[in-house]
Amino acid sequence: MEIRWGEGKLARLPALADELVRLKVDVIVAVTSPAVLAARQATRTIPIVMPLSSDPVADGLVASLARPGGNITGLSVMSSELGQKRLQLLKESFPRLSRPVAVLWNPDYVGMAARYRQAQGGASSVGIGVRSVEVRDSRDLERELESMDHERPDALLILADPLTTSQRLRIVEFAAAARLPAMYERSGFVEAGGLMSYGPNVDQIVRRAAIYVDKILKGARPGDLPIEQPETFELVINLKSAKAQDIVIPQSILLQADKVIE
């Protein structure tokens, strides 16, 4: 097995993908959407399996979810109801929300625009507003967090990408210090001290990617393997963090939780 890591630097991905192609690997597993793009640019023949793509059709990676075509297949973490459900859980947990929820996201990251639009649509359905907070690097993040001290939202929704994931401790610490309820896409943020997350189990999805690799190594063509979307989602709540922030999570929400960190 050959492992290549871009160290969070997207500019490194094309060279790393080219290197794997020169090694004539049998399959490339590209974890993020930018990595998939780099791998596709490097080869149209070596099979590529993507465990955590956002919207591979909208991103131009595959022709359709049912029949991807080409040399790419795998799994998507997108689901049409996710944006609405996350905001619905926020509203049910904090019914006094009146100001727009600040959505922290990176518009330069592949697939993120679709996830922000999903949040916008979900907000309309739930009956609350959202405010776009765009962060492209750590300097943007610090500036926007500081601005929230002056233009305070009622809650946060954090969209996960390499930037927000690498800065999750900073984001979690800010939300705790400001006593801002925050919803995250990934449970790793909650395990780091965040309040709550709702989304697919990433560990399970990555394990599913291994099944795709196995099928391809046994002769299946990637273009014939449908893209899987998550069917089950987990609500994770950090009750320890809630108590530290003097936040009371309604019992009705706690009963829905798949995991409670105490």
Residue ranges, per PLM feature:
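Short hydrophobic alpha-helices and adjacent helix-cap/hinge residues
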Residues: 1-262
